C-alpha cells in the first residue's frame, strides 16, 4: 500500500470519527430534555443571595515578586502554599498572614503546587518536567534553603498539575504537556501507572489539570487542550473510563463535585460545565455573556462544601460565584473592594469551606471569608 493510499485511508477514518461524534452529540441532545437549572426552576427553587458583607477580603498575602500560578490549602485549613514565577514556594499562615516557609526552587518556571494530606510536605512542578517534593520539617541547608527530599522524574513535557491521593502522603498524581497523567509512589520515586501516552484512549494534547475524587480516591478526572475531560480508574491505566465532550477550547481546570458523582470543567471557551460520571451526560453550562469583546478564559474553579456554589477565576480578573442549581452569577469578586488587579490564576477553598483564597498575576493572594471583617 502506497503512502498516498495510507493518507487517504487515514483522512477517511478521521472524517468518520468526526461524523460519529457529531451524531452522538445530537443524540445526547435529543435525550436531554432539560438541564439542572431548568429542572430547578420548574421546582420553584430560588437563587442564592449575597449581601455586600457576606463574602469579604479579610487577608492580603504579600511576599511574592512574580505572578502567582498555583495555591493549595492544608486539610487543617490554616495554612496555604503558593507557587510563583519568582521561583519560590511560600507557605503562609492563613490566620496571621505570616510566611512560615519560603523555598527557593531550582527551576523558577513553576506551574503547580500541592500540600500533602498530613501537611508535612509540599509538591511542585513546572517547565523542568519534574515534580519535586519538599519536607517542611527537614533542616535547611547552609544557604538557608530547604533541600529537595524527592524528585519524581519521568515526564517528557512540563508538569501542569499535581495532587496527592487523599489520606496518602505516599502517592501523588501529575498531569503533563506530554499528554499523560502519572501515578507516583513517592517513597520509591517510581511511576506506578501512566495514563495515556501510547494508549488509544488517552488525551491527544497537553493535559492541563487533574482532580481526584475524595469519595472514591481510585477515580480521577483530567482536562486537556484536546477540549475533552477524561475519567480514569487508577487501577486501569490502559484506557479511560469515559471521555466527556462539549468544550470548544482547551480545558484548563477540572474539579470533582463534593459528592464524587459529578465534576466541573473550565475552559478557554469561557464556559464551565458540569458532567455526571455515571451517565456521561453534561448537566449544566455556566456562561456569562461579555458583549462583543474577547471572551475571558476560565483559569480555575472550586465548589463549596455543599456544591451549591461554584467559584470561578477568569483571565480578565473576574471571580464569579455561581449558583450551581440555577446557573446564575450571585457575586463577582472582581467588582468589589480589594479585588485583584490582574488575571485570577488559581483559587481554592479551605477544608471547612469557611474561606476562599485567590491568587493572581498581580503577585498577591487574597483570602475571602464568609461574614468576615474586611481589611
Curated annotation (Swiss-Prot):
Pfam families: WD40_Gbeta. GO terms for biological process: G protein-coupled receptor signaling pathway. SMART domains: WD40. One of its GO terms (molecular function) is signaling receptor complex adaptor activity. Keywords: Repeat, Transducer, WD repeat. WD repeats lie at residues 63-93, 105-135, 154-185, 202-233, 246-276, 293-323, 339-369. Belongs to the WD repeat G protein beta family. G proteins are composed of 3 units, alpha, beta and gamma. Guanine nucleotide-binding proteins (G proteins) are involved as a modulator or transducer in various transmembrane signaling systems. The beta and gamma chains are required for the GTPase activity, for replacement of GDP by GTP, and for G protein-effector interaction. PANTHER family: GUANINE NUCLEOTIDE-BINDING PROTEIN BETA G PROTEIN BETA. This is Guanine nucleotide-binding protein subunit beta. It comes from Nicotiana tabacum.
Amino acid at each position: 500500500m502506497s503512502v498516498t493510499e495510507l493518507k487517504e485511508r487515514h483522512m477517511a477514518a478521521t472524517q468518520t470519527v468526526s461524523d460519529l461524534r457529531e451524531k452522538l452529540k445530537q443524540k445526547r441532545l435529543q435525550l436531554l430534555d432539560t438541564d439542572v437549572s431548568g429542572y430547578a426552576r420548574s421546582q420553584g427553587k430560588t437563587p442564592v443571595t449575597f449581601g455586600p458583607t457576606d463574602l469579604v477580603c479579610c487577608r492580603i498575602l504579600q511576599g511574592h515578586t512574580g505572578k502567582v500560578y498555583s495555591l493549595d490549602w492544608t486539610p487543617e485549613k490554616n495554612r496555604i502554599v503558593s507557587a510563583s514565577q519568582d521561583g519560590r514556594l511560600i507557605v503562609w499562615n492563613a490566620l496571621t498572614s505570616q510566611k512560615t516557609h519560603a523555598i527557593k526552587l531550582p527551576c523558577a518556571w513553576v506551574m503547580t503546587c500541592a500540600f500533602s494530606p498530613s501537611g508535612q510536605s509540599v509538591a511542585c512542578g513546572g517547565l523542568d518536567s519534574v515534580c519535586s517534593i519538599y519536607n517542611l520539617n527537614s533542616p535547611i541547608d547552609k544557604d538557608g534553603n530547604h533541600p529537595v527530599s524527592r524528585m519524581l522524574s519521568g515526564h517528557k513535557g512540563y508538569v501542569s498539575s499535581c495532587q496527592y491521593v487523599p489520606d496518602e502522603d505516599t502517592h501523588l498524581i501529575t498531569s503533563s504537556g506530554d499528554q499523560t497523567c502519572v501515578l507516583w509512589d513517592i517513597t520509591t520515586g517510581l511511576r506506578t501507572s501512566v495514563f495515556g501516552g501510547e494508549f488509544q484512549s488517552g488525551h491527544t494534547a497537553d493535559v492541563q489539570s487533574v482532580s481526584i475524587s475524595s469519595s472514591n480516591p481510585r477515580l480521577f478526572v483530567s482536562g486537556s487542550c484536546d477540549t475533552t475531560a477524561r475519567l480514569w480508574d487508577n487501577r486501569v491505566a490502559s484506557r479511560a473510563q469515559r471521555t466527556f465532550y462539549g468544550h470548544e477550547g482547551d480545558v484548563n481546570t477540572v474539579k470533582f463535585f463534593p459528592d464524587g458523582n459529578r465534576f466541573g470543567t473550565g475552559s478557554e471557551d469561557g464556559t464551565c460545565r458540569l458532567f455526571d460520571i455515571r451517565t456521561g451526560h453534561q448537566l449544566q453550562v455556566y456562561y456569562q455573556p461579555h458583549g462583543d469583546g474577547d471572551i475571558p478564559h476560565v483559569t480555575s474553579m472550586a465548589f463549596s462544601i455543599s456544591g451549591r456554589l461554584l467559584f470561578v477565576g477568569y483571565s480578565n480578573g473576574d471571580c464569579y460565584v455561581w449558583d450551581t442549581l440555577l446557573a446564575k452569577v450571585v457575586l463577582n469578586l472582581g467588582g468589589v473592594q480589594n479585588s485583584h488587579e490582574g488575571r485570577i490564576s488559581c483559587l481554592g477553598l479551605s477544608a471547612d469551606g469557611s474561606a476562599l483564597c485567590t491568587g493572581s498575576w498581580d503577585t498577591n493572594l487574597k483570602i475571602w471569608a464568609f461574614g468576615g471583617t474586611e481589611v
